């Protein structure tokens, strides 16, 4: 027969087994192929015949940190808002690729960007980078990266980024 003492021992053992087999949040993310990423990138404007952007603005640059590699992008839109005369802020959308690695997984990320930037001398920029695909070990990648920093078409810029990239 089961005594209260035996039942208590079985329950404690069962709880210990369940706790040992339950993945932590970090283990769960790794098992699903999701990675928290952070770092910085530098970028500069690209002009000439290799820039085929509808609005004439292309960029190239380098990512460092959990995402590392080369960046190429082209602006699809640059749009003033009703407040642009007072704020000097414009919105933009762009398409870009990052060829390199995410935490050692090599390939190319395909990214759709949406953000805002100021035309004032400090060049503040905020960018939401939506990862919509990839190649190589980054095939099927999805995720979001938030970036903020500075950018000028004349001098380029630097931004810090953080977000999450899921692969597979």
Label every model-predicted segment:
Residues 8-10, 19-34:
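C-terminal region of N-terminal signal peptides and the immediate post-cleavage residues
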């Amino acid at each position: 027969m089961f005594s209260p003492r035996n039942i208590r021992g079985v329950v404690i053992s069962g709880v210990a087994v369940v706790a040992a087999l339950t993945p932590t949040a970090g283990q769960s993310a790794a098992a699903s192929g999701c990675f928290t990423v952070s770092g910085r990138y530098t970028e500069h404007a690209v002009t000439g015949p290799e820039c085929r952007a509808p609005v004439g603005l292309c960029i190239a640059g380098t990512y460092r940190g959990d995402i590392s590699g080369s960046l190429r992008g082209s602006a699809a839109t640059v749009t003033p808002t009703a407040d642009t005369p007072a704020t000097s802020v414009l919105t933009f959308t762009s398409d870009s690729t990052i060829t390199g690695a995410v935490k050692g997984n090599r390939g190319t990320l395909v990214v759709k960007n949406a953000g805002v930037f100021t035309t004032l001398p400090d060049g503040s920029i905020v960018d939401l980078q939506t990862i919509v695909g990839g190649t190589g070990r980054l095939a099927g990648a999805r995720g979001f990266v938030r970036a903020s920093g500075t950018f000028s078409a004349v001098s380029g810029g630097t931004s810090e980024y953080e977000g999450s990239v899921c692969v597979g």
